[in-house]
């Protein structure tokens, strides 16, 4: 097995040069050893008993022209999801107020678009401004962006932009053909250049190999800056999509993925995203032990079910977890230590 240094040696500074063999060596560690290393890294950057809560609202559901094999919002598949218009501003604000009242500190708005069109930018910008005025962090996922659009979203008060890599470059073509991996990387670059925080992760349990999970995490960690938020989604199978009936991912492998994400991106929030509704409390507890410190809160994630808010509150009480409330006014991304050194040198 490839040698991997003790946890104390891997927390000193963030890395952006991970190889697939190195990440696979992490995955292959004995389970308890891997969890120990992840928890050690986690404690160097976070209070291990605090979890940040976000709420995700679909502001434009269905009708997407892309062919993501996991997504019930694609027009290419016969699913229960039907195309709907953009939600009115007041409906979005009502959802945001309710989310804040239940303990969410970040409000995420998702639209089933291939890319943000100019005619939709102004109403979305208004939503961002009004949600931020409520004292919440703001996040959107709107697809690819055109020239100058990221800057205009930033000016409206946007804190985070979500754009996932989904999986490894090698497996990517099995999941989507209507958007390239490079398209995704270019969108992330636009977001960074505009001074917006990046939310970027992927989906596991789509029939990929462990090497693909390692490849996804390596590509995330090797970005010029680590994403501030890393959502780890476990596939929610929806009848009518090509991935309905995909083999279930072993629960311990999911925990290993969370632990490796924590080690590779030590200062990022690692979020348990889609798929929590089918996770046992024990599995979620293992994920928190492995370094997950954020969840999506609320009974629906875009179009898929999520645990009830009462259930999440009870789980937090049983585990002694506290809510983390970041400042609502999020500053521009601060360079990582190694970037400061290279810039000044």
Swiss-Prot record:
Radical SAM core domain mapped to chain residues: 49-276
Pathway membership, UniProt: Cofactor biosynthesis; biotin biosynthesis; biotin from 7,8-diaminononanoate: step 2/2
Residues that hold [4Fe-4S] cluster according to the record: 64, 68, 71
GO biological process: biotin biosynthetic process
PROSITE patterns: RADICAL_SAM (PS51918)
Details of cofactor binding: Binds 1 [4Fe-4S] cluster. The cluster is coordinated with 3 cysteines and an exchangeable S-adenosyl-L-methionine.
Binding-site list for [2Fe-2S] cluster: 108, 139, 199, 271
EC number: 2.8.1.6
Keywords, comma-separated and alphabetical: 2Fe-2S, 4Fe-4S, Biotin biosynthesis, Iron, Iron-sulfur, Metal-binding, S-adenosyl-L-methionine, Transferase
InterPro entries to which the protein is assigned, alphabetical: Aldolase_TIM (IPR013785), BATS_dom (IPR010722), Biotin_synth/BioAB (IPR002684), Biotin_synthase (IPR024177), Elp3/MiaA/NifB-like_rSAM (IPR006638), rSAM (IPR007197)
Keyword Manganese assigned: no
Family listed: Belongs to the radical SAM superfamily. Biotin synthase family.
Subunit structure: Homodimer.
UniProt-listed NCBIfam families: bioB
Protein name as catalogued: Biotin synthase
Organism: Nitrosococcus oceani (strain ATCC 19707 / BCRC 17464 / JCM 30415 / NCIMB 11848 / C-107)
């Amino acid at each position: 097995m490839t040698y991997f240094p003790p946890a104390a040696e891997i927390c000193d500074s963030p890395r952006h040069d991970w190889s697939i063999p190195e990440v696979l060596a992490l995955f292959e560690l004995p389970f308890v050893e891997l969890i120990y290393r992840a928890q050690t890294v986690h404690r160097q950057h976070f209070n291990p008993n605090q979890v940040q809560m976000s709420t995700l609202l679909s502001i434009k559901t269905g009708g997407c022209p892309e062919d993501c094999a996991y997504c019930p919002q694609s027009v290419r598949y016969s699913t229960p999801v039907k195309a709907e218009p953009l939600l009115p501003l007041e409906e979005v604000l009502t959802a945001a107020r309710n989310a804040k009242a239940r303990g969410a500190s970040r409000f995420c708005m998702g639209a089933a678009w291939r890319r943000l069109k100019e005619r939709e930018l102004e109403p979305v910008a208004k939503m961002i401004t009004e949600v931020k005025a409520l004292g919440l962090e703001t996040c959107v996922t709107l697809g690819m962006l055109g020239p100058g659009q990221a800057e205009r979203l930033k000016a409206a008060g946007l804190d985070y932009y979500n754009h996932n890599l989904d999986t490894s470059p090698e497996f990517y073509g099995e999941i989507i053909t209507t958007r390239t991996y490079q398209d995704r990387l270019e969108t992330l670059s636009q977001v960074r250049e505009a001074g917006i925080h990046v939310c970027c992760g992927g989906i596991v349990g789509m029939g990929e190999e462990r090497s693909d999970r390692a490849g996804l995490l390596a590509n995330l960690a090797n970005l010029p800056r680590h994403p501030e938020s890393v959502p780890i989604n476990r596939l929610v199978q929806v009848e009518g999509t090509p991935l309905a009936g995909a083999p279930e991912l072993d629960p311990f492998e999911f925990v290993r993925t969370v632990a490796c994400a924590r080690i590779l991106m030590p200062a990022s929030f690692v979020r348990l995203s889609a798929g929590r509704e089918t996770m046992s409390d024990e599995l979620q507890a293992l994920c928190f032990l492995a370094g997950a410190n954020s969840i999506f809160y609320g009974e629906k994630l875009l179009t898929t079910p999520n645990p009830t808010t009462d259930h999440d509150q009870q789980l937090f009480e049983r585990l002694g977890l506290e809510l983390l409330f970041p400042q609502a006014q999020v500053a521009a991304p601060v360079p990582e230590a190694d970037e400061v050194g290279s810039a000044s040198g």
